[in-house]
Regions:
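Intrinsically disordered, low-complexity regulatory regions
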Residues: 1-122
Length: 122
C-alpha cells in the first residue's frame, strides 16, 4: 500500500467507522450525552480502581481477543472475520481516544501532591 493509498484508507476509515460511533451512532455504548466517561466512572465505583485503569482493562480484553485470533488465523479473510477485525480495531481506537480525553481532563485539573505520571520511568 502506498502512502497515498494508506492516507485515503485512513481518512475514509475515520470518517465512516470511527467518527459516527464517537459522535452519535454508538454514543450510548460508550457514554451518556452529558458525560463521555460515564460508563468508566461507574465501573470505577464498582471496581474501586481509577476510570483510566478500568478503560485499559477493557482495551486489554480487546487486544487479547485480537491476539488470539491472529495466532489461529490462516490468512484467509471471510466476511465474518473481516467484520470481527473491524469491530475489535474500531473499539480499540475509540478506547484510545477516550483514554486521551480522560488524560486531557486530568491535565486541566489542579495539581495535587503525590506520585503521578511525571514520576513514572520507562
Amino acid at each position: 500500500m502506498t502512502e497515498t493509498q494508506f492516507m485515503n484508507f485512513y481518512n475514509e476509515y475515520l470518517k465512516e467507522q470511527i467518527l459516527p460511533t464517537m459522535i452519535g451512532k454508538g454514543l450510548g455504548q460508550y457514554s451518556n450525552p452529558n458525560n463521555r466517561f460515564h460508563n468508566f466512572e461507574q465501573l470505577e465505583q464498582l471496581k474501586k480502581e481509577p476510570r483510566e485503569k478500568c478503560l485499559t482493562d477493557l482495551v486489554g480484553k480487546q487486544i487479547v481477543c485480537l491476539y488470539d485470533i491472529m495466532k489461529l488465523w490462516d490468512g484467509k479473510l471471510t466476511p465474518r472475520l473481516n467484520n470481527l477485525f473491524d469491530e475489535l480495531i474500531k473499539d480499540i481506537i475509540i478506547y484510545m481516544f477516550l483514554l486521551r480525553g480522560m488524560i486531557k481532563e486530568l491535565e486541566m485539573k489542579p495539581k495535587v501532591s503525590g506520585v503521578g505520571l511525571e514520576d513514572w520511568h520507562e
